[in-house]
Curated annotation (Swiss-Prot):
Post-translational modification note: Phosphorylation on serines by host CK2 is necessary for the formation of viral factories.
Domain remark text: The N-terminus consists of a long intrinsically disordered tail. The central part contains the coiled-coil multimerization domain (PMD). Forms a four-stranded coiled coil structure. The C-terminus constitutes the alpha-helical domain that binds to the nucleocapsid (N-RNA complex).
Family label: Belongs to the morbillivirus P protein family.
Residue ranges of the region described as Disordered: 33-84, 131-236, 256-281
Record protein name field: Phosphoprotein
Signal peptide bounds: none
Composition-biased stretches (Acidic residues): 146-157
Regions of compositional bias (Polar residues) in chain numbering: 44-65, 221-236
Gene Ontology biological process terms in this record: DNA-templated transcription; viral genome replication
InterPro entries, per database record: P/V_Pprotein_paramyxoviral, Paramyxo_P/V_N, RNA_pol_Pprot-P_XD_paramyxovir
Keywords: Phosphoprotein, Viral RNA replication
Domain of life: Viruses
Keyword Phosphoprotein: yes
Organism: Peste-des-petits-ruminants virus
Origin organism lineage: Viruses, Riboviria, Orthornavirae, Negarnaviricota, Haploviricotina
């Protein structure tokens, strides 16, 4: 049904635009209608209009020329447009015809429906009976936007036994003049038309076309305002306006911002509604009914205002206390962060101290295993080493039992330390080490750390091979020298080979 309505609305608007663009002459229209009516005789054949035969008579559901004649029906097989000529005495203007495409050419009874769905009996068979609405000439090309609200055809009762195809054909079979029959509906009329369509089973009734109202200008419209005058328990009086909210969604109503400033710190607001848990508690009537729920302001006593002021003050104090606690917590957290840093530094110091303790323990272990040759005291008189002469150059380093190793390295025994202080001791004498403990002089004929002296030993040959391999000579020279070394026999030849090798290496850069 909605598609059919949209189709007819679009067709009507197209006709209106075309007529506005090129309006025909009224005299020409009158002449055409008179000539068309004169061409129809009671006994003649109804000839379709040639101007509309190509476009308007292609479908059964589109408007056609009326048929006026006697009761006899004549069949015209030559007509290629699907029309069968009839003559009928009871033809009336304003009725819509239904084409019966049955194969039987005999006369039979059928029904003709008007735009309102009224059933008309008594007419005989006419496959292409078309009844014209026959509007006045002055109203034929009337504009669609300024069309009359009183339609010529009203929606009649719906026949349950009526074929939907016939109903659709009668609704669509309007002429151009019928498309211009537009009624402007707004507000409650739209709702009534929709309800009537629903109650009639959703069928489209011809004769009225809905017209969507224009969108109102929101910028120029002003919301309704109510004056508010509420005391604030002080000398000043708050005056302003509250605007009715047009929105029905949400649980919080809009409150305008106050333009007045109060010197008081605390002030109660009476225009704000109480909080709601859901939108149903404050949702008013829908906008379709045209009414909006208005805000109600509860009446409160002065004691209640004072109680609310006290609660507000206490809430402010609680919020200030919570903010102070929050700041204190931040300070504590910063201190804890610094403590964590100090803990890390302390752990590092402890590790360093433990390393130093390990080093000191290692040094003490080495010192405990060393016997330092220093003069000592507390020797026994009977000890043969007690008469060893003192060396003035020796000084005690660590307070240990000194002088224990002197008897082992000195020729003379230690001096008796138990002598009286009056006895003079020869301090100029120096102790001498034993020959067995003295180092032997360096032998220049043998290999030492000072110089390498080749011998007829395999170790000497290994040393010479290492010298050749580690040199910067070419590989061929190295191989040649190694072959010569293998051929050398005896210590004398080996010494000569070593001298030659030393001279060659000295010449290398």
């Amino acid at each position: 049904m909605a598609e059919e309505q949209a189709y007819h609305v679009n067709k009507g608007l197209e006709c209106i635009k075309s007529l506005k663009a090129s309006p025909p002459d009224l005299s020409t229209i009158k002449d055409a209608l008179e000539s068309w009516r004169e061409g129809l005789s009671p006994s003649g054949r109804a000839t379709p209009n040639p101007d509309t035969s190509e476009g308007d008579h292609q479908n059964i559901n589109q408007s056609c020329s009326p048929a006026i004649g006697s009761d006899k029906v004549d069949m015209s097989p030559e007509d290629n447009l699907g029309f069968r000529e009839i003559t009928c005495n009871d033809s009336e203007a304003g009725l819509g015809g239904v084409l019966d495409k049955g194969s039987n050419s005999q006369v039979q009874r059928y029904y003709v429906y008007s735009h309102g769905g009224e059933e008309i009996e008594g007419l005989e068979d006419a496959d292409s009976l078309v009844v014209q609405a026959n509007p006045p000439v002055t109203d034929t090309f009337n504009g669609g936007e300024d069309g009359s609200d009183d339609s010529d055809v009203d929606s009649g009762p719906d026949d349950p036994g009526r074929d939907p195809l016939y109903d659709r054909g009668s609704a669509a079979g309007n002429d151009v003049s019928r498309s211009t029959d537009v009624e402007k509906l707004e507000g409650d009329d739209i709702q009534e038309v929709l309800n009537s369509q629903k109650s009639k089973g959703g069928r489209f009734q011809g004769g009225k076309i809905l017209r969507v109202p224009e969108i109102p200008d929101v910028k120029n419209s002003r919301p309704s305002a109510q004056s508010i005058k509420k005391g604030t328990d002080g000398n000043s009086v708050l005056s302003g306006t509250v605007t009715e909210c047009s929105s029905i969604s949400g649980a919080t109503q809009a409150v305008p911002e106050s333009r007045w400033e109060s010197s008081e710190r605390n002030a109660s607001v009476g225009s704000v509604p109480k909080s709601a848990r859901s939108a149903k508690t404050i949702q008013g009537l829908t906008q379709e009914s045209g009414t909006i729920a208005s805000l109600t302001q509860p009446k409160e006593n002065d004691s209640e205002f004072e109680y609310e002021d006290d609660l507000f003050t206490e809430m402010q104090e609680i919020r200030a206390s919570i903010a102070k606690i929050h700041d204190d917590n931040k300070t504590i957290l910063s201190k804890l962060d610094s403590l964590l840093l100090l803990k890390g530094e302390i752990d590092t110091i402890k590790k360093q101290i433990s390393k130093q303790n390990i080093s000191i323990s290692t040094i003490e272990g080495h010192l405990s295993s060393i016997m330092i040759a220093i003069p000592g005291f507390g020797k026994d008189i009977k000890d043969p080493t007690s008469e060893v002469e003192l060396n003035p150059d020796l000084r005690p380093i660590i307070s240990r039992d000194s002088g224990r190793a002197l008897a082992e390295v000195l020729k003379k025994p230690a001096v008796d330390r138990s002598q009286k202080s009056g006895i003079k001791v020869n301090s100029g004498s120096k102790g001498q080490l034993l020959k067995d403990l003295q180092l032997k002089p360096v032998d220049k004929q043998a290999s030492s750390a000072i110089e390498f002296v080749p011998s007829d030993h395999e170790s000497s040959r290994s040393v010479i091979r290492s010298i050749i391999k580690s040199s910067k000579l070419n590989i061929d020279h190295k191989d040649y020298l190694l072959d010569l070394l293998n051929d050398v026999k005896g210590s004398k030849d080996l010494k000569e080979f070593h001298k030659m090798l030393t001279a060659i290496l000295a010449k290398q850069p």
